């Protein structure tokens, strides 16, 4: 399943691999087939390796990528561990080079049309609008005017509310990244994975309805 088909990518990090597997399974059962593991803690690569092995063995069709990558070395490390896509908060040409060499999709964080154009020149298929809360749907709509071919994925500033999702998709985004608004601290503390499963399903249904 592609980012366009899915319309949503859950974003998640936790240092506990066993808890991560439960999050992964809940998202999978809820209908998600893409997940971005955000590399934000010590030994995060070890956690990702466990999650990716679990997904390959137990969750057919689940595609894991890695976010919060800020240099080519980290991108190379995660690709060696099986990352299917790389998401970055910044536009860096060194990351573009290592991902393109391995034919792994990369999505750089961009905040201007100049950055977006440069990313596309470097082979980027979908840009990350970050932080989405700073720019908003109006920015996306403005970009899509002169550049209707540009695929945009906002993260930050995206919620599971219908009005929020409608605003983004009507502006022309390809998909959205959802972190704590979907996989909340409360869900993790209470280990309420059934609620997460239901929230993922409901959000995917909302996106489908908004797009139709």
Predicted regions and their residues:
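Glycine-enriched alpha-helix->loop->beta-strand junction motifs that scaffold or abut catalytic
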Residues: 28-33, 79-86, 101-107, 121-126, ...
């Amino acid at each position: 399943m592609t980012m366009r088909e899915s319309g949503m990518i859950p974003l998640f990090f936790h240092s506990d691999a066993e808890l991560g597997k439960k999050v992964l399974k809940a998202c999978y059962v809820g209908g998600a087939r893409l997940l971005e593991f955000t590399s934000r803690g010590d030994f995060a690569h070890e956690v990702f390796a466990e999650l990716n092995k679990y997904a390959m063995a137990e969750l057919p069709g689940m595609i894991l990528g890695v976010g919060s990558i800020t240099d080519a070395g980290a991108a190379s490390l995660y690709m060696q561990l099986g990352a299917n896509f790389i998401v970055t908060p910044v536009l860096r040409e060194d990351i573009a080079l290592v991902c393109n060499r391995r034919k792994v999709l990369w999505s750089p964080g961009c905040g201007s049309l100049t950055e977006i154009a440069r990313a596309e020149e470097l082979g980027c298929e979908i840009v990350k609008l970050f932080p989405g809360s700073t720019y908003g749907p109006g920015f996306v709509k403005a970009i899509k005017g002169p550049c209707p071919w540009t695929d945009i994925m906002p993260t930050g500033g995206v919620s599971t509310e219908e009005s929020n999702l409608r605003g983004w998709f009507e502006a022309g985004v390809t998909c959205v990244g959802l972190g704590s608004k979907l996989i909340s601290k409360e869900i993790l503390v209470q280990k309420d994975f059934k609620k997460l499963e239901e929230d993922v399903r409901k959000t995917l249904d909302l996106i489908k309805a908004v797009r139709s």
